[in-house]
From Swiss-Prot:
Complexes and interactors: The cytochrome bc1 complex contains 11 subunits: 3 respiratory subunits (MT-CYB, CYC1 and UQCRFS1), 2 core proteins (UQCRC1 and UQCRC2) and 6 low-molecular weight proteins (UQCRH/QCR6, UQCRB/QCR7, UQCRQ/QCR8, UQCR10/QCR9, UQCR11/QCR10 and a cleavage product of UQCRFS1). This cytochrome bc1 complex then forms a dimer.
UniProt-recorded name of the protein: Cytochrome b
Domain of life: Eukaryota
SUPFAM superfamilies from the UniProt entry: a domain/subunit of cytochrome bc1 complex (Ubiquinol-cytochrome c reductase), Transmembrane di-heme cytochromes
Biological role stated in the UniProt entry: Component of the ubiquinol-cytochrome c reductase complex (complex III or cytochrome b-c1 complex) that is part of the mitochondrial respiratory chain. The b-c1 complex mediates electron transfer from ubiquinol to cytochrome c. Contributes to the generation of a proton gradient across the mitochondrial membrane that is then used for ATP synthesis.
Note, other: Heme 1 (or BL or b562) is low-potential and absorbs at about 562 nm, and heme 2 (or BH or b566) is high-potential and absorbs at about 566 nm.
Amino acid sequence: MTNIRKTHPLMKILNDAFIDLPTPSNISSWWNFGSLLGLCLIMQILTGLFLAMHYTPDTSTAFSSVAHICRDVNYGWFIRYLHANGASMFFICLYAHIGRGLYYGSYMFQETWNIGVLLLLTVMATAFVGYVLPWGQMSFWGATVITNLLSAIPYIGTTLVEWIWGGFSVDKATLTRFFAFHFILPFIITALAAVHLLFLHETGSNNPTGIPSNMDMIPFHPYYTIKDILGALLLILTLLALTLFTPDLLGDPDNYTPANPLSTPAHIKPEWYFLFAYAILRSIPNKLGGVLALLLSILVLIFIPMLQTSKQRSMMFRPFSQLLFWTLVADLLTLTWIGGQPVEHPYIIVGQLASILYFLLILVLMPTAGLIENKLLKW
């Protein structure tokens, strides 16, 4: 008798994706982040669903409804902080996952990579509209500043901004539609993640060496299921520690003040995971230029497969490229720090230099290093 998991139409799909999937025998813990992202997504959808049961998307009651969730709903404070800090964990895993792809040349699976970039943009959009919902000062002013950037688009900009706002300022209509977007987008992300996985399983996983993986494959279960469970436990432990001991560590105190259109906070800044892009936006003293740089800071990922000059796929045996990769990581951390600082000397010039270095590393220095390493191979 054949096993049901290999014959049943639904079970077969799950079996081919998570049980009998041939997986390279040498993938490291950097390959854990894919499953951790899936876990984060499920956690965010579940906590979000319970929050949506008590939240009211209305300017007069939104802030109070969040306070009500934290004070009166059974374990409401826990669900709310799991959701808020879960977003931070989501982005940590996301950036680690992208970093792994860059380091080991996983971007050469172009369809998988491009869907991944699309996923990144969708998750960023979801996090942005979600940050507006508590209707605190930073929610309101963050929404105002970021949506206002669209007014930099020539000719149609102002009309577009008012269309998104649903009026002449960020108001009730904006909050209601942002709640609708925040509810629907995670399900779109889930569908995109399934397509991401579908394309990945067409080619199979990459591995740290960058050579073809089909030399030595092992079944996903039990080897990598147990490894993924370890990663999941560490993720949950970190999230619980963050949520139960320092729930407001990554948040902004300004968001505990109800939104007030008549008083602007001293420093308007997004959540930490957007600070690098915000620093790039601010470093260009021109509205349209800043918006284009902001977009390009994410969309530059699409061009990475086209900029592959090295004959080796992975950076495992490429010391020059490794040096540039870790310089890029340090540069992104610098940009994240600058994004949270006020616009004054010396932060302005540091931000501008870090922004130039960011694009220079990805578009010029890394491809050049690849060519140099090719030459060195011939020695």
